């Protein structure tokens, strides 16, 4: 599993999470294609993931990066950590993330670490249960981050102050 990182001129941090070779068997033999899973973020709460498929690895990575830039979400962060502890699942992958105090660092494995780093989360405790398939872990992590809302946004939706809802 590769974990390459690149900073682009648009200010996005790009990470390659996984490259997978798949084979289609035909009458004349096997046809190999590659799939790439990438995550892109600005380090300030915007993050996206994408998958790309092609006959060559660089083309698959390029398609995945473009898909990730199109599929970006805004995550409400509390400084350099999460707002509150959250759970999410996708397929057989289950994830748990909780905020951590300053200086803790990103304690997460594999695909979750890549997403949290490009999103700009510097202090978090995270655990993946069940299947550790990177594609499902990325989906589950995104579900958890997408569902997270700051107290300010909840208060604004309800037309109340933050003190009234806490």
From Swiss-Prot:
Record-linked NCBIfam families: rpsE_bact
A Pfam family: Ribosomal_S5_C
Keyword RNA-binding part of the UniProt annotation: yes
Domains (record comment): The N-terminal domain interacts with the head of the 30S subunit; the C-terminal domain interacts with the body and contacts protein S4. The interaction surface between S4 and S5 is involved in control of translational fidelity.
GO cellular component, one term: small ribosomal subunit
Gene Ontology biological process terms in this record: translation
Encoding gene, per UniProt annotation: rpsE
Transmembrane segments: none
Native source species: Stutzerimonas stutzeri (strain A1501) (Pseudomonas stutzeri)
Keyword annotations of the record: Ribonucleoprotein, Ribosomal protein, RNA-binding, rRNA-binding
Name by which UniProt lists this protein: Small ribosomal subunit protein uS5
Lineage: Bacteria, Pseudomonadati, Pseudomonadota, Gammaproteobacteria, Pseudomonadales
S5 DRBM domain mapped to chain residues: 12-75
Listed InterPro entries: Ribosomal_Su5_D2-typ_SF (IPR020568), Ribosomal_uS5 (IPR000851), Ribosomal_uS5_bac-type (IPR005712), Ribosomal_uS5_C (IPR005324), Ribosomal_uS5_N (IPR013810), Ribosomal_uS5_N_CS (IPR018192), Ribsml_uS5_D2-typ_fold_subgr (IPR014721)
């Amino acid at each position: 599993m590769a974990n390459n990182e690149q900073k682009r001129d648009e200010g996005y941090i790009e990470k390659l999470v996984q490259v997978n070779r798949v084979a289609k068997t035909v009458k004349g033999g096997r046809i190999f294609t590659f799939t790439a899973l990438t995550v892109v973020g600005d380090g300030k709460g915007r993050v996206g993931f994408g998958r790309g498929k092609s006959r060559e690895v660089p083309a698959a990575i390029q398609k995945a990066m473009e898909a990730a830039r199109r599929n970006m979400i805004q995550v409400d962060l509390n400084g350099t950590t999460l707002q509150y502890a959250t759970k999410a699942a996708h397929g057989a992958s289950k994830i748990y993330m909780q905020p951590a105090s300053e200086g803790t660092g990103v304690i997460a494995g594999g695909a979750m670490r890549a997403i949290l780093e490009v999103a700009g989360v510097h202090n978090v405790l995270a655990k993946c249960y069940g299947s550790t398939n990177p594609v499902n872990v990325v989906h589950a992590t995104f579900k958890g981050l997408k569902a997270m809302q700051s107290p300010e946004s909840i208060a604004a939706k309800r037309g109340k102050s933050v003190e009234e809802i806490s």
